[in-house]
């Protein structure tokens, strides 16, 4: 009995010893694990634990404003409400949780705890259709209040779900095998599906959110507005050419004021945005100015909004709150920088109204007929106009018709022909025609190839052996096959050659310069590269691309070698009158005339006024045009407008009446007309997607000149006007340019006292002596 008791005691001691060893082993294991957690991996797990105690909310930033030269707002962010749907609604979790709560409530807590898992799921399945129907009703109400189709709402939610699932898959691929993933933040937050709802809608949606928690949320946002997206401009019709003149004024609605310049923003974040500047960098750090699909955003998609995206874009703020201590850490958002332009919005709107065919000048009119083939009277013509301040290079107006918004009022055939939305002032290129003549002269004198006082005879045709090639416009049967030298009784000075637009003079000048001399001079004038106006952003020339501004067309080295190899002398001489392989934009034309007015000083046109926002490689220096050449060129341009024989002096109507083109009191205009051969006009007439209609033999109409008050000693503004397929430069582009000059007067850029005196002025019929039988200015100035 004693032995049995001793044995039992021994076994008990052994069991206690074993348990002690096991306990000590467990303590040792736990100690090692505790050491690992607190010492070896302590910092990592502390950071992880603290991160779960933190909540982070992003604060929206404000995009910088775009302002005109007077400080008028052209684009700005204003407060707005966005509508967000919780991800639990999007992936179906909300309906399942709603059904589960209903099922538990129907069984009661006690019974719910005793039934099997399968039984619970069965009850939930019975309640799920009711919850889904309830949720569908909520979404129907959201769509109704937001005035969007339910299908659009469903499409937005599907897009969100697809994006979040891609993020989850990416996280799963990066995780350790077998490790259970926690929900990512996108699965626990709301996602914007409708932007910019009114206050009343936001209020109603908040009531809906209170009734159905966890479904819809109204969040603070911003929307981009363009206060000058449209304007109504009142124009004086008493200043129009006689056949269009009528008493009083007309109000022209101008949609899309500056839309091709300012541009637009988009809400969608594209892959290229995230690639260029991700919100979360590869090292896990956050760029508060970066892009993320999960955060509402506004991104420049065209125009200056896109070109100056980084300038205008701000940085979001952040609010972090610790759940354990309620400590709040706040990083304030940084707004984007404002961008000030050189353009005057009121002048711009007025010029765009002048270009609108409703005003009458850019519709084909009976007195404009000329050339080989004409368009029907009343045909709408695309057009562009540019105004540059000579002293600064500031672009005051950069107008084009039709704008994108103008396209809504055009027929399908007109949209095909007129291509609304193209910024013809800066992006479209055209053969310059005769408007280059003063520039070619100045280049020849600057290069030492011509004396400033050179006189050249006009023989009607440049090549003695070919009387039907390289002709002057006056050497035609309708003018009696005469010459300018016959009319002036001798060789022509540059003043006479410019005012009469003699082709032979400038054929001769181009021949003296040679192919490379002419091409190099065109490049000096700004062709072959964009001007760095800011329309393409602050990037240097090698990164600017093609959008926003065209570099123009001029022969490159390979082209010149081909021309030289085949001894093509004809191309050289026609380059002297702006024909052949050369084309430029109205912006480049106005810029070149401003350069001539400054005597060659390079101060290229700019649309952005902030120097820090302009490209770093804008041109400097001077083309060093001799003062005598500049003086003579400007005098020739003055005579072209003021002398009765000048190509920019008058328009002749069908009844024989001739009326001065420019009649602005107190203002001096010096300019050059151009009638440039145009490529065939083609368009889709029946809307089948094929451009089957074509008209050949048409011309583009140019007028480019310099403007000042009569009392000024120097030109103040350079003006360029282009009317596509407008025919005669004097008859079509000239009257448009006259109205642009009137706009400068009305907006106070020319003498204010004369602006007041000119209000309400009308015109009387003006007849001019033909001067000994001298022919009218040409319908066409190009060689054939």
Task: Give names to the regions the model predicted.
Residues 361-370, 647-651, 748-752:
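Surface-exposed helix-capping loop/turn segments at secondary-structure junctions
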Residues 315-336, 343-347, 369-434, 439-723, ...:
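Beta-lactam-recognizing serine transpeptidase/beta-lactamase-like catalytic domain environment
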Residues 72, 81, 136-140, 144, ...:
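Solvent-exposed, polar/charged alpha-helical surfaces in well-ordered, non-transmembrane soluble domains
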Residues 1-332, 356-384, 390, 403, ...:
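Membrane-proximal periplasmic segments of bacterial cell-envelope enzymes
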Residues 298, 727-731:
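Ordered, soluble secondary-structure elements with a strong preference for glycine-centered loop motifs
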Residues 597, 641, 738-749:
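Short amphipathic alpha-helical signal-transduction/dimerization elements
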Residues 751-768:
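Intrinsically disordered, low-complexity mixed-charge segments
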Residues 267-274, 450, 598-603, 749:
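Short helix-capping/linker segments at secondary-structure and domain boundaries
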């Amino acid at each position: 009995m004693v032995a049995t008791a001793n044995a039992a005691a021994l076994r008990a001691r052994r069991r206690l010893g074993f348990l002690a060893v096991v306990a000590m082993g467990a303590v040792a294991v736990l100690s090692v694990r505790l050491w690992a957690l607190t010492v070896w991996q302590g910092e990592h797990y502390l950071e992880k634990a603290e991160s779960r105690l933190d909540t982070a909310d992003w604060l929206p930033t404000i995009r910088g404003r775009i302002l005109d030269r007077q400080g008028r707002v052209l684009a700005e962010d204003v407060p707005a409400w966005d509508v967000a749907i919780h991800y639990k609604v999007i992936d179906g979790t909300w309906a399942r949780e709603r059904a589960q709560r209903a099922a538990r409530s129907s069984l009661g807590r006690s019974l719910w705890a005793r039934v099997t898992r399968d039984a619970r799921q069965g009850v939930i399945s019975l309640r799920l259709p009711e919850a889904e129907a309830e949720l569908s009703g909520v979404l129907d109400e959201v769509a109704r209040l937001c005035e969007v189709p339910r299908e659009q709402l469903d499409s937005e939610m599907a897009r969100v779900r697809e994006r979040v699932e891609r993020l989850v898959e990416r996280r799963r691929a990066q995780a350790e095998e077998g490790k259970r993933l926690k929900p990512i933040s996108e699965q626990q937050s709301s996602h914007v599906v409708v932007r910019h709802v009114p206050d009343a809608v936001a209020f109603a949606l908040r009531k809906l959110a209170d009734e159905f928690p966890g479904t819809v949320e109204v969040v603070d946002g911003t929307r981009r507005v363009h206060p000058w997206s449209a304007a109504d401009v009142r124009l004086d019709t008493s200043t129009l050419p006689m056949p269009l003149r009528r008493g009083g004024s007309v109000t022209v609605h101008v949609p899309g004021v500056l839309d091709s310049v300012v541009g637009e923003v988009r809400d969608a974040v594209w892959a290229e945005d995230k690639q260029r500047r991700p919100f979360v960098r590869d090292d896990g750090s956050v760029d508060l100015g970066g892009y993320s699909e999960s955060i509402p955003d506004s991104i420049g998609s065209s125009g200056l909004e896109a070109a100056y995206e980084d300038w205008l874009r701000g940085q979001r703020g952040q609010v972090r709150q610790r759940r354990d201590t309620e400590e709040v850490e706040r990083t304030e958002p940084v707004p984007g920088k404002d961008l000030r332009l050189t353009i005057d919005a009121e002048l711009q709107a007025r010029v765009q109204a002048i270009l609108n065919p409703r005003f009458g000048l850019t519709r084909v009119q009976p007195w404009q007929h000329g050339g080989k083939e004409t368009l029907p009277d009343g045909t709408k013509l695309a057009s562009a106009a540019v105004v540059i301040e000579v002293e600064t290079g500031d672009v005051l107006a950069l107008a084009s018709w039709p704008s994108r918004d103008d396209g809504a009022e055009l027929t399908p055939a007109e949209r095909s022909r007129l291509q609304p939305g193209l910024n013809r002032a800066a992006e479209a290129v055209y053969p310059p025609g005769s408007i280059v003549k003063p520039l070619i002269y100045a280049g020849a004198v600057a290069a030492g190839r011509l004396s400033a006082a050179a006189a050249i005879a006009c023989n009607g045709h440049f090549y003695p052996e070919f009387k039907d090639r390289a002709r002057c416009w006056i050497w035609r049967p309708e003018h009696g096959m005469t010459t300018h030298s016959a009319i002036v009784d001798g060789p022509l000075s540059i003043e006479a050659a410019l005012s009469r637009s003699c082709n032979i003079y400038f054929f001769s000048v181009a021949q003296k310069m040679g192919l490379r001399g002419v091409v190099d001079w065109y490049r000096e004038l700004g062709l072959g590269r964009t001007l760095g106006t800011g329309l393409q952003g602050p990037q240097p020339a090698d990164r600017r691309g093609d959008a926003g501004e065209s570099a123009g067309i001029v022969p490159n080295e390979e082209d010149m070698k081909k021309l030289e190899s085949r001894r093509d002398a004809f191309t050289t001489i026609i380059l002297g009158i702006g024909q052949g392989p050369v084309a430029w934009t109205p912006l480049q034309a106005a810029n070149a005339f401003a350069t001539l007015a400054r005597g060659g000083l390079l101060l290229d046109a700019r649309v952005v006024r902030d120097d820090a926002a302009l490209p770093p490689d804008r041109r400097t220096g001077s083309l060093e045009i001799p003062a005598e050449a500049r003086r003579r060129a400007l005098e020739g341009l003055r005579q072209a407008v003021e002398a009765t024989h000048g190509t920019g002096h008058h328009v002749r109507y069908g009844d024989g009446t001739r009326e001065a083109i420019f009649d602005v009191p107190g203002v001096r205009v010096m300019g050059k007309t151009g009638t440039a051969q145009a490529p065939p006009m083609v368009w889709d007439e029946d809307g089948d997607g094929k451009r089957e209609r074509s008209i050949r033999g048409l011309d583009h109409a140019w007028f480019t000149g310099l403007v000042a008050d009569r009392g000024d000693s120097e030109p103040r503004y350079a003006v360029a006007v282009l009317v596509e397929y407008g025919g005669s430069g004097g008859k079509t582009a000239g009257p448009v340019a006259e109205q642009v000059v009137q706009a400068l007067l009305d907006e106070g850029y020319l003498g204010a006292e004369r602006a007041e005196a000119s209000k309400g002025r009308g015109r009387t019929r003006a007849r001019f002596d033909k001067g000994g039988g001298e022919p009218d200015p040409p319908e066409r100035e190009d060689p054939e």
